[in-house]
Amino acid sequence: MNLFRKKSLGQVHPGLNRHLRLWDLIILGIGAMVGTGIFTITGTAAANLAGPALIVSIVIAAFCVGLSALFFAEFASRIPATGGAYSYLYAIFGEFPAWIAGWLTVMEFMTAVSGVASGWAAYFKGLLANLGWRLPTVLNGTFDPAVGTYVDLLPILVMVLVTALVLMNAKAVLRFNSLLVLLKFSALALFILVGIFHLNPGNWANFAPYGFGEIYGGQTGIMAGASLMFFAFLGFESISMAVDEIKEPQKNVPRGIVLSLLITTVLYILVTLVLTGMVPFKDLNVEDAVAFALRQVGAGWAGNYVSLVAILTLITVCISMTFALSRMIYSLARDGLLPKAMKQLHPKTKIPQNATLVAGSMAAIAGGVFPLASIASFLNICTLAYLVMLAFALLKLRKEHGAPGPGEFKTPLVPVLPILSIVVCLSFMTQYSLSTWLAFGVALLIGIGICFGYGYGHSEENK
């Protein structure tokens, strides 16, 4: 049994249509990253973990993600294949490590989509509450019999809509996604412009109420805030999962990843700075923090606009991540590690239809049953684990194949940056609770079971 059989470096699979340009990739990345994190998580993280110093947490999280983005950019330019970290590790470490990375990526995007759907539901409920409407209790929250909630209906309904959209022509869907991203920017720009006139510098006086926190094992403070805000940047790697559909991938993928990450970081810092300046940070422990802050300063009209736009545009994150998740499942099935039905393409649109249906169904179930806070921590730890693997893979790539050639993206300061990334990611992982680690362990065991129960025996490498 050879668990470490490899694919050749740069092996590409035809089949999908190449139609995505640099602008499409930037919009895909921003659409995935600017969502629940900026509309919801910023408020709860400021209230419970870092206070106004959350802007420092964001810079730390962005730095960590930025390191990994550089690695993704180099891999994408040297190994142009759909599947992201999974495909890169397949070429460097072999099948079993690649499967672990691929499985963790599926877990990441499945929980990310469901988390965003939950954030969308929170804003929609807030808007309904302002109109005096409320869903029946049994359908108005994730599973918690003690308070009478059993399923959150709204995240399930929005995932049905998103799945239907992603099953349409991919180019048309991403054009629609671009329009919604621009609408999202209009709401955030309005928030910043209105918020500037309602800033109270006294709200920043207690800048770091929870301190810096512990480098390893902390539960509050700037580092704990950074570990949670890591959630905000997840999705940048979605670009590398659609390489087979990108024009000039070796040039456009690195540019798309870096540019979308830079734009997103600036936007998060501005919004968090204004948010914590408008309202005392302790009051921000709400699920619709941006709209809530506007209503607190008497700008209810702007708060309602932000709520409406959030309802419309959080769908962009669901679209971007469902798009990426379906391509990840397709990649695993194409290599024989998941049932071959998952690699079936629609004869006309060339969209992996069964993989898309599975992706949407898993996200709908998770969003309807699990609370947002537990979703965010679980997907973060899954992502951090495979980013550690990716950093090790870059070190091995450079050792065995040397520096990138002409026209390929080159990560600077190797091996310093990969080693630094490993240290930072491991530090973030220690910030999570025992229950998060248990969920991570169970997910790993399930993934290993699928690998040995199905994947190894059906792998294309057997042929």
Positions of PLM-derived features:
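C-terminal membrane-solvent junction of multi-pass transporters and transport-like membrane proteins
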Residues: L16, V147-V151, A341-Q353, L387-W437, ...
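Helix-loop-helix junctions that connect adjacent transmembrane segments
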Residues: Q11-N17, I55, G132-L153, L179-L308, ...
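Loop-to-transmembrane helix boundary motifs in multi-pass membrane proteins
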Residues: N17, L22, D152-I156, K247-R255, ...
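Membrane-interface loop-to-helix entry segments
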Residues: L104, A121-F124, Y150-P201, I257, ...
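Transmembrane helix-loop boundary segments of multi-pass membrane transporters
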Residues: T44-A50, L54, T105, V116-A122, ...
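Extracellular loop-to-transmembrane helix junctions
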Residues: N17, I41-P145, S260-I263, F440-I448
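Membrane-helix boundary/coupling elements in multi-pass transport proteins
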Residues: F39, L104-A122, L228, F233-I246, ...
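Membrane-interface "cap" regions at the ends of multi-pass membrane proteins
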Residues: M1-G43, A47-P52, V65-L70, T82, ...
